[in-house]
Amino acid sequence: MRKQMIALAALCPLTAFAVSPVHNRVIDYVPAPGQFVNVLPEWEDGDDAEAMAAKALQYMTEEGYYISLGAWGGYVTVGFERTIVNVPGKRDIYIEGNAFQSSQSSTKGGNSEPGVVMVAYDINHNGIPDGNEWFEIAGSEYSKSIHNYEVSYIRPASDNDDIMWMDNQGNSGFVNRMPFHTQPYWPQWLSGRSKLTFQGCRLPDNSVNEGTADDPY
């Protein structure tokens, strides 16, 4: 399944002044299966969800790396020391991704991986995303997207097998393994779960293959 939803959720407190405009916490890090899962950041034997959230924060803030959210539905929830203010006509939040222009083509776009962003105000002031109202930031394709979309991934019997997915639109397929990335694609700190289900917004299939390779990577 090539189309992804990369969700980043932001939990914002009420502060009298801005200590830092950059997120300072990773509350949840739950990637869907994928080729860079367990690598960005690296999972090591014994790492649980809390350890992986700490590694995700370190990767993004201290080392300047990207983290993998896997296939559709994977997400990370981060917290800020300041409130994200909606200023009309201004960009209120900046998120850096790994989109780039292909060196083999003059066409701009390259490896573009759009995502969905949701924000919430920590109205109960407990620092965790419970009982707060979440708002999806409407991007350019909001009206063309499938809302209330759902995908379930089924853990295979072997980490060497492709991972089956099924959605609530009657579609199914596989997250295929690649020879370039041989580690387990299932999040290993979630190895006790036989199924991972994600819900959210599915962006439309706008990507166009303008390459010349017979078997594009």
Predicted segments, located by residue:
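A domain-level signal for the mature, folded cores of soluble proteins
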Residues: 19-115, 133-217
